Every structure is written in structure tokens, then in C-alpha cells.
Amino acid sequence: MDTFKQISGRIAPMLEPNIDTDVIMPKQFLKGIDRQGLDKGVFFDRRFMAGGQPNPDFILNMPGWQSATFLLVGPNFGCGSSREHAVWGLKQLGVRGLIGSTFAGIFDDNCQRNGILTVSLDEPALARLAQLAASADTNSITVSLDRCEITTAEETISFVISELKRAMLAVGEDAIAWTLQYLPEIENFEVAHYSRRPWLKRPASPLG
């Protein structure tokens, strides 16, 4: 997983509420688990027209917002079914951060596991950011995870994130990798636990 410390890039506004995972990654792109080529599926029904040509009216196809690093999203972004393909696709498309008011819980967790930062801001801050994101002349921002700040052309906006989430994103580790650093302590606890309560330990299976 890629690290996230300080990243600069353009932010694209997608402020519609309740954009669900079926919109982010349509079902026809869920067939594999190898994570290959999922960037093509992101917002497929909006990015492309019936004949497969790019939709010129979709924000991520417009010159000032192509290859956007951040998305400014509406409330309850990522709702719907739990499909990690949606997050994999966003990451492959180059999205490193989502800024909004609220995110669906499972989707938010999937972003955390895959190196995409989610930031929740209050409505006044989102409104100011939306005004800047709407113009290609002012839609460049810098997000510092170390300082928990978003720097725009006009101001610096502070945000709050849990220390555990910040630390894991900063070093590029998911929950499994983060837990493995405590393996010696876990093993020591297990030995001590079963030495005091041996009746809790399951006998070895005869099948190995």
C-alpha cells in the first residue's frame, strides 16, 4: 500500500448526495479479484457514452479535472453494496483522497485499507472548497497528513482524523500489516494465557 504524507493535486467536485458503489464501480467489472484494469470501470456509465466514447460533460473527462488526485464528494458517498472493487478502481485511477461530509461506513473502511484518505469537513468549509474546485484555475490543493491540513489557493483548512488511521496511512500499512508488528507481544500473551488456563487450548487435530 502506498504511503500518504503530503500530496498535491487537483480536486474535482462530485457533490451529488448518495453516490453509491454501483455508480462508482458497475457490476460488470466485479468478475475478477486480481485488481487489474479496474480504473476503466470507475464511474463507467457516466464517464463513457453508449458507443464507448468519453462523455465530454463528465467532470473527470474535462481538461481541468482529468487525472484529479482528490474528489470533493456529496454526503453518504460510497453507500450501497460492499464492493472493494470500487475502492481499488478509484486508487488505480489515481485518486488518493476523498473530501466530503459523510461516507458510508464499510466504504470508508475499505478506503483506509487501500491507502485512500477520507476527510470529513463541516458544511462551511466544504462550500468554500467547492467554490475553488469548480474552477480549473483554483482547483489545486495540497493535503498534509502530518499536519492534518488542506491548503488551497486561499486558505488552510484543518481536519480531524483518528491517530491510528493517520499512522497507518502515513506508513502505508493495512490492518494486517499493522497488527503483525505486535506479533511478539501477541505470542507472549498467548503463551501466558494458556499456561494459566490450559483447559481453553484446543487439542491438536489428528488430521494436522
Curated annotation (Swiss-Prot):
InterPro entries assigned to the protein according to its UniProt record, in alphabetical order: 3-IsopropMal_deHydase_ssu, Aconitase/3IPM_dehydase_swvl, AconitaseA/IPMdHydase_ssu_swvl, IPMI_Swivel, LeuD
Keyword Lyase included in the entry's annotation: yes
GO CC, any one term: 3-isopropylmalate dehydratase complex
Reactions it catalyzes: (2R,3S)-3-isopropylmalate = (2S)-2-isopropylmalate
CDD domains reported in the protein's UniProt record: IPMI_Swivel (cd01577)
Keyword Cell division: no
A GO BP annotation: L-leucine biosynthetic process
Top-level enzyme category: lyase
Recorded metabolic or biological pathway in which this protein acts: Amino-acid biosynthesis; L-leucine biosynthesis; L-leucine from 3-methyl-2-oxobutanoate: step 2/4
Cross-referenced Gene3D superfamilies: Aconitase, domain 4 (3.20.19.10)
Family: Belongs to the LeuD family. LeuD type 1 subfamily.
Name of the protein in question: 3-isopropylmalate dehydratase small subunit 2
